[in-house]
Amino acid sequence: MTDLSSWTAYFQDFGQFFNGFLFTLALAIGSFILAMVLGIFFGAMSTSKRPILRILARIFVEFYQNTPLLVQFVIVFYGLPLISDHTIMIPIYWTAILCVGLYHGAYIAEVIRSGIQSIPSGQMEAALSQGFTYISAMRLIILPQAFRIILPPLTNQIVNLIKNTSTVAIISGVDLMFVTKSWSALNGNYIPAFLGAALLYFSLCFPVAQFGRKMEQANKKAYSL
């Protein structure tokens, strides 16, 4: 059903889609903050001279990179209440932030690791010899230089994170994808619903991608001077 009436019905109920869009936006922001914190933390651990820290970081990265995000949603939202006799029950919003944040935190950790390792090791050694702690050397010397290297893959991860928020629909989160699926199934208007959802996701992802490209170009100009 793709005639004018289907689009009329879609725009009449657009408020539902917009609320789902706002939920998706809030979810993306929360997940991104968690993913960045975890990514920087485990990315730095991956380059530590202490084997135990590298091993722990590797376990985190390998586990989340090699298990499907949908499975992680099911385990956290449905599994934890069952194994804890319903003493651990995480709300849908926080479940989504936790799962998406952990999942992309593992990928961002690899991006951070590759960026750190691209910086000559002598810079860290020089910083430590000047009295910097490992953390302060990372924060003030290594990571700022690594940023221009990791910007393109980091931008890709942010875009993927936004798109992967749609997986919260599996636990009936009121995000854009869940609203789209529910509304289209109820009304039989699949094309307007999913085309509208695609445009709304595009309105989130495209500006991020463009911003990343502009930042990358600005960095290239700055370092070429």
What name fits each language-model region?
Residues M1-L225:
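Transmembrane alpha-helices and adjacent helix-loop boundaries
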